[in-house]
């Protein structure tokens, strides 16, 4: 979870009211933060804020916390309003960046008055959003520039690796290749673009370089100081919705410092957009649902008032509420998310505890304990555990695994339904558009993101997959699986099979392998795993085409098994 430092004096200046340290400890809860530490430095009191929500980047700075507290205390209510004036600035996006880093969104913020603390918060927010929300700049990278040194129009273009500019913190020009090899940020983030035919570059009309996304800004325009009054903000990445949200978070935070937001026209090959877009988002909820789940007797008017303290504009109609909420939030996906905001505004500490009406004695779930036993075995074999996302997409589960959609990744034990993914009807991003049916693609993605790390790489995951089962009420079934992948120059089928042998031995199970054909694996080096006459998994050496699809240059051997048919209570 993100942690960041804030000055008590700066927070109180933004809120417009002073509080004791003890009062601040309670106030931080409104911003889904905990006060992790307090210290004094040069006569000033500082707080270490520990955010407890990775879905609210708008709360990862002093500006966001102060804004939330003003609303929570009733000093303001309803939808925060930010005026966006249209500028005549245009950014042209090069179509060659389509497979490199395709999207950029931009804004101008004028009239800033930045002291040292405001500058620290701006840099902190930029870094935290890119690190956590942007997954270490892979999905979101942010640049902020002195706009007075920029000559529009601006071009986000594909550049030859031999082009040169002076990177931030240096005095001499370096080629783009040299920056990746010698600059601290190039070494840290260079793997994101190193293998691409071109590198992204943001330049103005005079050819002056603003930045090399997602690596480093230029010394000319990328050094923002307390003397800077007008800034140009750029956000690049792979998902237009995600980078738009990041832009909204940054510009509204700067607006809390008195900045005036101006939009920028962004021209792509086949469409154009105006950014930022601060149009409020909409959601509908029934207040009876809120009352029932909250367990608190609240009137419609009381719920409306609580929501207005959490940035909502509320329109009541026949027990339903039409809600509008700010464009710097993207965490409202279900009525439960609205309920959470109601309870935060109400105050969790104000909810009276009730004794359970049933006398029960708790204990750990036996199958979960079995999963932990399997994890301990894997760690004992020298494997490193990874935890990847349940959400994925059809390309990762099928195309990159050299499978046509509809082929079995491998069959579910006990019966053989059509190999269909559980897909999301309205995904927030194409990357997260389905629930995974098998784990090996997740491990392949992990390996593809760590090709710059030392080999051998020996990883495993015990995780959930979701399969379609028409006999279930929900038409789906969640299955726990174990997957192992080993990558190094001399890895073989035998090496990964030895781990499978040992797992089965420790669980007191006998198994057999039956050779099969499977496009994800090398022919003749793949088999299905059978226990008690049931197919429970697959094992083999990954096909070179799959390795190429994932950008992995090392051989990989892997296996995956369902855990439920391996579960035997005596082994806990």
Swiss-Prot record:
Alphabetical list of SMART domains matching this protein: B3_4, B5
Organism: Thermococcus onnurineus (strain NA1)
GO MF annotation terms: ATP binding; magnesium ion binding; phenylalanine-tRNA ligase activity; RNA binding
GO cellular component: phenylalanine-tRNA ligase complex
Catalytic activity, as annotated: tRNA(Phe) + L-phenylalanine + ATP = L-phenylalanyl-tRNA(Phe) + AMP + diphosphate + H(+)
Keyword Repeat among UniProt keywords: no
Main location: cytoplasm
Residue ranges of every copy of the B5 domain listed in the record: 278-353
Subunit structure: Tetramer of two alpha and two beta subunits.
GO process annotations (BP): phenylalanyl-tRNA aminoacylation
Designated name of the protein: Phenylalanine--tRNA ligase beta subunit
Pfam families on file: B3_4, B5, tRNA_synthFbeta
Reported cofactor(s): Mg(2+)
Family: Belongs to the phenylalanyl-tRNA synthetase beta subunit family. Type 2 subfamily.
Name of the coding gene: pheT
